[in-house]
Amino acid sequence: MKNLTDSFVYLGHWPSAGSFGFNTDILATNPINLSVVFGVLIFFGKGVLNDLLDNRKQRILNTIRNSEELRERAIQQLENARARLRKVETEADQFRVNGYSEIEREKLNLINSTYRTLKQLENYKNETILFEQQRTINQVRERVFQQALQGAIGTLNSCLSNELHLSTINANIGMFGTMKEITD
């Protein structure tokens, strides 16, 4: 390894007269040689450098273009999401309003139904009371009539003879049958 390093050191110290070698002393180098080397580097390196810079520029432009496309898609997706959100909020508001309306409607229906039921119960109660009053009145009439009839029969039995008694009974039975037909 040392021999290899020494050989490079010796290349830098070759004599300059009549031979070709590397001059590592920059201050001693001829400006014309430097300008030729720089010219060759610039001439050939310019194309390579331009290609590298153009490739880099194209990659940067493509990245920017892709970023812009992604940004536009993201903006579009955001707008779509906002539109869906507005639509969902509107539908939620409609459901809420419809729900409140439905609750109020059901409440009114329940109140009306309860009112009708109470009214029917009141009518049934009044009909039952009237029916019971009529039944009681008819029972009282029948008892009064029976008592009057028994009293009349008792009076007739004590005051009349058998023959008169039988004719009076037949007349009363006929009147009773007529009265019964009238009351029915």
UniProtKB/Swiss-Prot annotation:
It is a single-pass membrane protein. Belongs to the ATPase B chain family. One of its GO terms (cellular component) is chloroplast thylakoid membrane. F(1)F(0) ATP synthase produces ATP from ADP in the presence of a proton or sodium gradient. F-type ATPases consist of two structural domains, F(1) containing the extramembraneous catalytic core and F(0) containing the membrane proton channel, linked together by a central stalk and a peripheral stalk. During catalysis, ATP synthesis in the catalytic domain of F(1) is coupled via a rotary mechanism of the central stalk subunits to proton translocation. Component of the F(0) channel, it forms part of the peripheral stalk, linking F(1) to F(0). Pfam families: ATP-synt_B. It comes from Draba nemorosa. F-type ATPases have 2 components, F(1) - the catalytic core - and F(0) - the membrane proton channel. F(1) has five subunits: alpha(3), beta(3), gamma(1), delta(1), epsilon(1). F(0) has four main subunits: a(1), b(1), b'(1) and c(10-14). The alpha and beta chains form an alternating ring which encloses part of the gamma chain. F(1) is attached to F(0) by a central stalk formed by the gamma and epsilon chains, while a peripheral stalk is formed by the delta, b and b' chains. This is ATP synthase subunit b, chloroplastic.
